[in-house]
């Protein structure tokens, strides 16, 4: 590739073919980075005659010469990421050697998913037809600096403190505003 750095951007809220373009260019790249979004997005690739659907992993993951980076702007749902790695590993091979994830990525929690669902069902909010996967609420936490990030999982004390503080906020919202049952701490700590 002649360019030292190349960005592939979509300006139409998805479905422009960014993943296919990145896949095509990854043969000649050292690395490709997914810089934002969550597992609501998706791109379909054909690799060695097999259909692959990616949601969190950059499409460069199928190219053994390119590192695949997940940047700090991505909100990560651990279950979805692990399932995707498990599904793609037999096809792409050596994923963990090529995959790098920013420790500053926000982790999507069960309370994000619940809030997303409650907002979509509520008449008090203008619904936008989300995928109900907690992407928007996770970004709300990121912007308000209360998000649980990957790096927080390295310290059980810090992780539990952050989860307790954030869960108290969400439980107040669930109970007082939506009239719903509070989430138990164990319901959110399982993702780590």
Q: Residues of each region from the PLM?
A:
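N-terminal phosphate-binding or glycine-rich loops at protein starts, especially the Walker A/P-loop
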Residues: 4-37
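Glycine-rich nucleotide/cofactor/substrate-binding loop typically near the N-terminus or early
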Residues: 36-188
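Conserved small/polar residues in nucleotide/adenosyl-binding loops
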Residues: 191-192
């Amino acid at each position: 590739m002649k360019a030292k750095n190349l960005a592939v951007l979509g300006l139409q809220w998805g479905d422009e073919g960014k993943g296919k373009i990145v896949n095509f260019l990854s043969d000649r790249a050292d690395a490709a980075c997914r810089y934002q979004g969550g597992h609501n997005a998706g791109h379909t690739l054909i690799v060695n005659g097999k259909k692959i659907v990616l949601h969190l992993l950059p499409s460069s993951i199928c190219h053994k010469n390119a590192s695949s980076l997940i940047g700090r702007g991505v909100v990560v749902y651990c279950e979805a990421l692990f399932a995707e790695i498990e599904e793609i590993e037999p096809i792409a091979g050596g994923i963990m050697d090529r995959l790098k994830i920013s420790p500053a990525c926000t982790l999507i929690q069960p309370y994000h998913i619940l809030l997303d669902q409650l907002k979509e069902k509520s008449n008090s909010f203008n619904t936008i037809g989300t995928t109900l996967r907690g992407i928007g609420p996770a970004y709300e936490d990121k912007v308000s600096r209360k998000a649980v990030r990957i790096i927080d999982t390295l310290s059980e004390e810090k992780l539990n403190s952050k989860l307790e503080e954030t869960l108290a906020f969400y439980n107040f919202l669930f109970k007082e505003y939506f009239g719903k049952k509070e989430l138990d701490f164990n319901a959110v700590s399982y993702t780590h």
